[in-house]
Amino acid sequence: MQALNAGCHVLTEKPISNNLKHGQEMVDLAKKLDRCFAVDLNHRFTPAARVAKKWQNDGLIGDLLFLNMALWIGRFQPHFDTEFYHLKALNPHSCDILRYFGGDVDQVH
């Protein structure tokens, strides 16, 4: 919030906060100050995602009717074996990639 108050645009890591109220305050402040406030969701910039997006834009893969995505972390690693680790660490990337290729979500099954 110091950077926003100083007039800076902000690119941050996820999660923007461990507290929903605090996160919303940051988003609201950025809107009030007309500053960009973005979360670095870098999976859309991987080589595979870039190629797939090019194919999509060039019409090589047709219309997407359904999207499904799974991410995982390799072998067991004790520091990753914490409550909700996968949810916090990977699901934001899944949601971003799904929206990158499919647009805003209309329906969830």
Q: Language model features by range: what are they?
A:
Residues 1-13:
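Rossmann-fold NAD(P) dinucleotide-binding segment
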Residues 5, 57, 102-103:
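Residues at helix-coil transition
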Residues 2, 54, 97-100:
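Residue-level signal for well-ordered alpha-helical scaffold segments within enzymatic catalytic domains
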Residues 77-109:
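Rossmann-like dinucleotide-binding domain that binds NAD(P)(H)
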Residues 17-80, 87, 94:
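A contiguous active-site-proximal alpha/beta segment in oxidoreductase catalytic domains
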Residues 12, 39-41, 109:
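Short loop/edge segments at beta-strand edges and connector loops
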Residues 2, 60-61, 107-109:
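Short, intrinsically disordered, charge-balanced linker/junction segments flanking boundaries
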